[in-house]
Swiss-Prot record:
GO terms for molecular function: structural constituent of ribosome. This is Large ribosomal subunit protein bL28. Keywords: Ribonucleoprotein, Ribosomal protein. NCBIfam families: L28.
Amino acid sequence: MSRVCELTGAKANNGMAVSHSHIRTKKLQQVNLQKRRLWWQEGKKWVNIKISTKALKSIQKVGLDKVAKTNGVDLNKF
């Protein structure tokens, strides 16, 4: 299973770790993924989904159905 948000498609970012002496090494910044069981109002069922915390924040603000439609995700497959 890859570390990708099932709702937004967010995945790891390539970055640099910089030491005190300014030596740079490559670093992989992973997405903060959480497994959640969310209630889908329109489908009248629970949805088990692995989402990023940013997506979870968006869901709390505008709702699961609206976030899924914006990102083109079919919640029936979960």
